[in-house]
C-alpha cells in the first residue's frame, strides 16, 4: 500500500480555517491553533445567541405592548387576558408592530379587549 502524505489536505484544512478567522485581531487571524480555538468559540456564541435572540425579541415585544396598553389605561396581562377571551388571536410580534406603526388600530384592539374584561 502506498504511503499517504497529508500535506495537501492539511494545507486545505488550514486555509479553510484561516478564511473563517479572517478579520480577527492579531494572531487569531494568522496562527492556526489560536484561530481554531477562536472560530470554535465564535461558532458556539453564534449557536447560543440564535436561541437568545428569540428570548430577547419576545421580551422587547412584551415591553412595547405593555407601554402602549398602559397609554390606553390597561396593563399587559389584562390586555392579553382580554384578547384571549375575545377570541382575538394576534401574536405578540404583530401586536408590538401594530403598537409602534399603527397606534389607532392598536387602540381599537385594546377597546375590544376592555369590553370583555
From Swiss-Prot:
A cellular-component GO term for this protein: ribonucleoprotein complex
Single biological process term from Gene Ontology: translation
Gene Ontology MF terms in the entry: rRNA binding; structural constituent of ribosome
Signal peptide extent: none
Presence of keyword rRNA-binding: yes
Keywords per UniProt: Ribonucleoprotein, Ribosomal protein, RNA-binding, rRNA-binding
Gene3D superfamilies: 6.10.160.10, Ribosomal protein L20 (1.10.1900.20)
NCBIfam families: rplT_bact
Biological function: Binds directly to 23S ribosomal RNA and is necessary for the in vitro assembly process of the 50S ribosomal subunit. It is not involved in the protein synthesizing functions of that subunit.
Family that this chain belongs to: Belongs to the bacterial ribosomal protein bL20 family.
PANTHER family xrefs: 39S RIBOSOMAL PROTEIN L20 (PTHR10986)
Name of the featured protein: Large ribosomal subunit protein bL20
Amino acid at each position: 500500500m502506498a504511503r499517504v502524505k497529508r500535506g495537501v489536505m492539511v494545507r486545505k484544512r488550514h486555509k479553510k480555517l484561516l478564511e473563517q478567522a479572517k478579520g480577527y485581531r492579531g494572531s487569531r487571524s494568522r496562527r492556526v491553533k489560536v484561530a481554531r480555538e477562536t472560530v470554535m468559540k465564535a461558532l458556539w456564541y453564534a449557536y447560543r445567541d440564535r436561541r437568545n435572540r428569540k428570548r430577547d425579541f419576545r421580551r422587547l415585544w412584551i415591553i412595547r405592548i405593555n407601554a402602549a396598553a398602559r397609554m390606553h389605561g390597561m396593563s399587559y396581562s389584562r390586555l392579553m387576558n382580554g384578547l384571549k377571551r375575545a377570541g382575538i388571536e394576534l401574536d405578540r410580534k404583530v401586536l408590538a408592530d401594530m403598537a409602534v406603526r399603527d397606534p389607532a388600530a392598536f387602540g381599537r384592539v385594546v377597546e375590544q379587549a376592555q369590553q370583555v374584561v
